A protein has these predicted regions:
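Terminus-proximal functional modules
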Residues: 18-285
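Fungal secretory targeting signals
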Residues: 1-20
Length: 285
């Protein structure tokens, strides 16, 4: 199985501490571009697959990457792209769709000069209908939620990002599938996100995606929550973590048998991280 990881925009980033969980999965945060690329290649050589990736511009003005890889018993063919312009993104969508792939995740961030996109693709072996959007305004995304939900689609991936000093934009991936009810929020301050988070938990909804993002000097949060049965093992979500704090949180949840499924970075008086951890069974870490 041949996998590609392509970067069109090179940047030099400050390497931050990387945390690893060995065995069935591995997780890294705060990687520079070359280290990120090397990690993907090294694990690909061992037949591991990328399950999540994200990027953000750190306080030094360089791009830092976060990465989660797993060693599943079997998986569909997959491809990754990163540091794509909007035009590159649109060309890749047409190319990969024509080859029978579907977009699993898109992550957008305000780059050093322009907005950049990361993309994770899987072979669409089950012919699942899907759709994607980038550079949507808040109003456009809100309209999309209503339209796609009405037509039986679920939000699979959501990424918020800044455009200039005053405009928030959103990238999303949708798939036509049944599933638990969802709640989606965008444009929240940290305090507003905490309020929504607490209320969602009371109502039986738990985070499956969290996307903190910068626009200008502001920090905002977007997220997807899904309803879970009372007996289900719930995910754990934390944000506002420094790199060192994230390492401690990571180690704490790893000892309890959890793994990160989302790791996202942003700037807020320095580099901060947000993550979602899910319980795994028979995981070797």
């Amino acid at each position: 199985m041949k996998i590609s990881a392509i970067a069109l925009l090179a940047s030099v980033a400050t390497l931050l501490p990387a945390v690893e969980g060995w065995g069935e999965w591995a997780s890294f945060h705060g990687l520079d571009r070359q280290t990120f690329h090397n990690k993907v290649d090294a694990y690909n050589d061992r037949d591991w697959v990328v399950t999540y990736m994200s990027a953000f511009t750190n306080s030094h003005g360089n791009i830092s990457y976060n990465l989660i890889m797993e060693n599943p018993e079997k998986s569909p063919s997959w491809h990754t792209y990163y540091e794509q312009t909007a035009d590159d993104y649109r060309g890749i969508v047409k190319y990969r769709r024509d080859l029978g792939f579907r977009l699993i995740q898109t992550d957008a961030h305000t780059g050093t000069t322009i907005n950049s996109f990361l993309m994770l693709w899987n072979a669409n072996n089950r012919d699942i209908p899907w759709a994607d959007h980038i550079n949507q305004s808040s109003d456009e995304f809100t309209t999309a939620i209503k339209d796609y939900t009405r037509n039986g689609y679920r939000l699979k991936s959501l990424s918020g990002y800044g455009f200039g000093d005053r405009l928030q934009q959103f990238a999303s991936v949708w798939e036509k599938a049944s599933g638990a009810p969802q709640r989606v929020y965008i444009g929240l301050t940290a305090a507003e996100y905490k309020t929504k988070f607490d209320q969602a938990r009371k109502d039986g909804y738990y985070p499956v995606k969290i996307s903190p993002y910068n626009f200008g000097k502001e920090v905002r949060f977007a997220g997807i929550f899904e309803h879970m049965d009372n007996n289900a093992v719930k995910p754990e979500c934390q944000w506002g973590l420094t790199s060192d704090e994230y390492v401690k949180v990571f180690n704490n949840w790893r000892k309890k048998g959890y793994k990160p499924t989302v790791v996202n970075g942003y700037r807020d008086g320095g580099e901060k991280y947000a993550a979602i951890f899910n319980k795994v069974t028979n995981a070797k870490v």
